[in-house]
Regions:
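Nuclease catalytic cores that cleave nucleic-acid phosphodiester bonds
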Residues: 30-33, 37-39, 47-61
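Preference for solvent-exposed, low-hydrophobicity sequence contexts
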Residues: 50-55, 59-247
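Phosphate-binding/switch loop-helix module in NTP-utilizing enzymes
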Residues: 1-44, 123
Length: 247
């Protein structure tokens, strides 16, 4: 998120914007949330940070950031949203940006970021047989990347890396990542055009034999690159998984 926001800021300034305001939402609970706010302020090289209605947060950020930090009181009337309402609104926004069309993209002809299937195909029958005997599911594809291998298994459940043990680990010769075909459906992605603009997309399916991906997306122009995210949406566009490689 920090990288994407910084990129958007740079683009806006490059197109002549006098200033850029970034609304980071008001949810700041716990250390990771604090670090995220700080990283974002640093990532966009913020001249000023405005804290609304939270003196404790204001004091913390003032000690942590080189930016000018300002405090303003909360408005007398404000909307307070619970977890369920936030979830519903997020789902509605996903629908608004993703519904409207489908398309296929050949993953052989574009750059791929954030996906195991973008690695170099790696054939090792001993490794494949050893893994299949351990997890009880067919191995669809093995790819190699610097320092490890990624194993794509034909399973609806998410197979965990710790399930790959013993001889299979030794044959892999490094880090082992495991992706299940069932986890791929519903992964958020971005289709990048020739100008570097990222268009929202939702992965519907991947044919691993032809390396063709089907996406829900409004974008129908030329695709130069596909960036796979680490968020998986369910049928009602609710977030089911966050923070792990899913493709």
């Amino acid at each position: 998120i920090v990288t994407a926001v910084a990129s958007l800021r740079a683009r806006a300034r490059g197109e002549g914007a006098a200033f850029v305001a970034v609304d980071t939402d008001g949810w700041v609970k716990g250390w990771s949330a604090l670090e995220y706010k700080i990283d974002l302020a640093r990532g966009v090289n913020a001249d000023a940070v405005v804290v609304v209605g939270d003196p404790e947060l204001y004091g913390f950020l003032e000690k942590s950031l080189e930016s000018n930090v300002y405090y303003v009181r909360s408005p007398s009337v404000q909307a307070v949203r619970g977890v369920d309402e936030r979830r519903r609104l997020r789902s509605e926004n996903y629908i608004r940006f993703l519904e409207g069309g489908t398309r296929e993209v050949s993953l052989k002809s574009v750059k791929i970021q954030g996906a195991c299937i973008g690695g170099t195909p790696f054939e090792d029958e001993r490794l494949k047989a050893s893994i299949e005997s351990q997890i009880g599911s067919p191995v669809k594809l093995i790819t190699r990347y610097p320092g490890g291998v990624c194993i794509i298994v034909d399973s609806e459940r998410q197979v965990e890396p710790h399930e790959i043990k013993g001889a299979a680990r030794k044959l892999a010769g490094g880090e082992v990542l495991v992706v299940s075909t069932g986890s791929m459906k519903g992964v958020l992605a971005a289709l990048v055009d020739a100008d570097g603009v990222e268009h929202p997309a939702l992965l519907v399916d991947v044919d691993l034999d032809t390396m063709t991906a089907t996406f829900k997306t409004r974008f129908q122009g030329e695709v130069r690159k596909v960036i796979f995210g680490r968020v998986k949406l369910g049928e009602e566009y609710h977030e089911e998984i966050r923070g792990r490689i899913l493709v």
